[in-house]
């Protein structure tokens, strides 16, 4: 155990990662050294920032807490604190089941944790995060919470109502990060497309995106977690006309069959979904769409699932992720539906869905062979420089693998022109041409 050291372990999504970065800055401001590597935890203070979204994430969080309890018993770490979404939802249960943890805090209880340690909370440090990502890219959380009421989702229970961050704060944070070398920003939120309604009485996502793209030094802005219902169409000209706004949109659709969209309380129809996708692709030529789909929601029939498969074949998404339904306490589903789809059927449908997408992804990537794309280098690994195009977000999307060449050194964080020389379903191979 090392004195004056804090280890923060982050589980779950990029929004959770931003929360950890805010907390780490508070520890730094109080004179601690901070670390964010779960493989080398040995601090006198350990904070596990948990995820509580679905069953698998909850299980991972509990297992991580138990691992840290064992490390504490063995004397490898000092005090152990748990915060985040799982603790927000199930704090009292966790206290009973794992009492060895020194204290449990909710998702937004940074001040209470710092106060518990007898330290000062520095409000001015809230917009000066300690980045855990490579310096050249960062996640920018533009809002917190969600006002939607999807049947399956526990996020509004955990995070509360939607709360936009003031636009001036976001502009200032990006300017500051650019000064320290950040060039790429992933705009994230539980619901990106609700931005501004609470603060300004109108959707201001297009204006925010334009203002951020005007900041000198911003190379790429990428938009994550849009909601299809009431999509702000004024965003599309901004994406089309501004070179540093990536031709990329992450918009979770979940399903396509009208009966399922109704049961999910998505407030959009099949016809409206097709129309929106056509509008986006028409107004922003070359855009890459990423979506998330779900299998096994209560009431999903074979006909519903076949409709979903056909939708994926029709639209041919450039990027797609999927997961199985998880029956979460406190949700509309929990109160109104039975979890009536066997887990084996959920998994079988998930596998079939992803097999269809793998073939589509392979075709998309093969079509890129011979093309030239701007690539940012993230790291060197196993004989390759590993990078991404504007169509690829960190961690979740394909990567570009560029073999080492004698006499050629590529720098992480630099942008290069590359020619695609080969393709796999979820990766590209390339060579530098500039």
UniProtKB/Swiss-Prot annotation:
InterPro entries: Elp3/MiaA/NifB-like_rSAM, Methylthiotransferase, Methylthiotransferase_CS, Methylthiotransferase_N, Methylthiotransferase_N_sf, NA-bd_OB-fold, Ribosomal_uS12_MeSTrfase_RimO, rSAM. Binds 2 [4Fe-4S] clusters. One cluster is coordinated with 3 cysteines and an exchangeable S-adenosyl-L-methionine. Its cofactor is [4Fe-4S] cluster. [4Fe-4S] cluster 1 binds at residues 13, 51, 85. SMART domains: Elp3. Residues 132-363 form the Radical SAM core domain. Residues 366-434 form the TRAM domain. It catalyses: L-aspartate(89)-[ribosomal protein uS12]-hydrogen + (sulfur carrier)-SH + AH2 + 2 S-adenosyl-L-methionine = 3-methylsulfanyl-L-aspartate(89)-[ribosomal protein uS12]-hydrogen + (sulfur carrier)-H + 5'-deoxyadenosine + L-methionine + A + S-adenosyl-L-homocysteine + 2 H(+). GO terms for molecular function: 4 iron, 4 sulfur cluster binding; aspartic acid methylthiotransferase activity; metal ion binding; protein methylthiotransferase activity. Keywords: 4Fe-4S, Cytoplasm, Iron, Iron-sulfur, Metal-binding, S-adenosyl-L-methionine, Transferase. GO terms for biological process: tRNA modification. It comes from the Bacteria. It is found in: Cytoplasm. Residues 4-122 form the MTTase N-terminal domain. Belongs to the methylthiotransferase family. RimO subfamily. This is Ribosomal protein uS12 methylthiotransferase RimO. It comes from Porphyromonas gingivalis (strain ATCC BAA-308 / W83).
